[in-house]
Amino acid sequence: MTVNPTHTALWPAPHASGAVDATVHVPGSKSVTNRALVLAALASEPGWLRRPLRSRDTLLMAEALRTLGVEIEEGVGPEGTGEFWRVIPAGLRGPATVDVGNAGTVMRFLPPVATLADGAVRFDGDPRSYERPLHGVIDALRVLGARIDDDGRGALPLTVHGGGALEGGPVEIDASSSSQFVSALLLSGPRFNQGVEVRHTGSALPSMPHIRMTVDMLRAVGAQVDTPESGGEPNVWRVTPGALLGRDLTVEPDLSNAQPFLAAALVTGGKVVIPDWPSRTTQPGDRLREIFTDMGGSCELTDFGLVFTGSGAIHGIDVDLSEVGELTPGIAAVAALADSPSTLRGVAHLRLHETDRLAALTKEINELGGDVTETADGLHIRPRRLHGGVFHTYDDHRMATAGAVLGLAVEGVQIENVATTAKTLPDFPDLWTGMLGA
């Protein structure tokens, strides 16, 4: 967890002068967009993505697939329908070099794809990407027949020597540090000669909604997937080999990126509407309806979207966030402004995210006058009167939006490198000031 010295620009987080009352159109889901790109690239026919997220992580994924030979055409539909991407599969080829940035989905989902390429594919990325675990994917692919050079690091940079096909079959992995290890193998599994059987052997799996998302999206393009939820063995997922269909998919709004805007309603006692909130979804962000209601708000899901209203009071919460760890920074920010203590549990794996999020949240909230203690698997937060100061982001988009939430209630908060929000939420500063009517 280090402050990036190259990002010294400070953004004065707007202070709310009253209750917010806004409708915020949240861009598409990063998790859905990047899974859809991989599945479309592996399909047997062209497919369409409508309203995809255009952000650093998704553009890195699209460019990586283009580097491997996939054609992705970009356009804009009739008025009101938004952007679309047409994905035209092709034989995957090397040699190629893929820049993963610091995108977990790119660094983990694409090495399995690269095993199907005809030639070597080198993966590299931001300095922080070298510290993020990839051993689960690397070791599993070797068991399944792949040749990978990583100098024994279990991390980037690495080279996958694609042979045009991969045998596949059964493999055991410990995915307790990232559910993306499971998703990575499942997404490419239909293209392996024997499919794939992934058996998780470690402690509790984090972020299960993301695995459910992967399974749902695989089934939507014609894959046969057996899961623990569908009567299979515990902690075992099987994907049968077979062709994938090209689909026409409209990407849902990114519900995790709706978090700071919903938090604004809670913090200011106002109202925020998020259009097109799905009635059924596997996105972790859907848990916000329950969590933020428990913290003092109320919500109504209408045909138009989600209407979330703050009561003017913010309550502490004791909550297990193991399945929805990415929501932790925003919840911690709200909890620091509550009327009673909070305990956030089940998120030890956040130490391996874009930064060590538990250490970062503790340090930054405490430097504004807060009282946050790291626990073995989370945070204990005792609300205190906060004051202004610099809130460092550590190149982490969710740290930046958490700082913005604090700034609503605390004058003088300055966020270092708010531009890091472009990873998943382009134009966040404009959306934020627009919500406030600034």
From Swiss-Prot:
Location of the active site: E326 (proton acceptor)
Entry superkingdom: Bacteria
Binding site residues for phosphoenolpyruvate: K30, G104, R132, Q180, R357, R398, K423
Pfam families: EPSP_synthase (PF00275)
Example of a GO biological process term: amino acid biosynthetic process
Swiss-Prot/TrEMBL catalytic activity: 3-phosphoshikimate + phosphoenolpyruvate = 5-O-(1-carboxyvinyl)-3-phosphoshikimate + phosphate
Spans traversing the lipid bilayer: none
Binding site for 3-phosphoshikimate: K30, S31, R35, S178, S179, Q180, S207, E326, H353
EC number: 2.5.1.19
Entry keyword set: Amino-acid biosynthesis, Aromatic amino acid biosynthesis, Cytoplasm, Transferase
Cross-referenced Gene3D superfamilies: Enolpyruvate transferase domain (3.65.10.10)
GO cellular component, one term: cytoplasm
Main location group: cytoplasm
Pathway: Metabolic intermediate biosynthesis; chorismate biosynthesis; chorismate from D-erythrose 4-phosphate and phosphoenolpyruvate: step 6/7
Gene Ontology molecular function: 3-phosphoshikimate 1-carboxyvinyltransferase activity
UniProt xrefs under HAMAP family: EPSP_synth (MF_00210)
Similarity comment text for this entry: Belongs to the EPSP synthase family.
Quaternary assembly: Monomer.
Stated role: Catalyzes the transfer of the enolpyruvyl moiety of phosphoenolpyruvate (PEP) to the 5-hydroxyl of shikimate-3-phosphate (S3P) to produce enolpyruvyl shikimate-3-phosphate and inorganic phosphate.
Name of this protein: 3-phosphoshikimate 1-carboxyvinyltransferase 1
Name of the encoding gene: aroA1
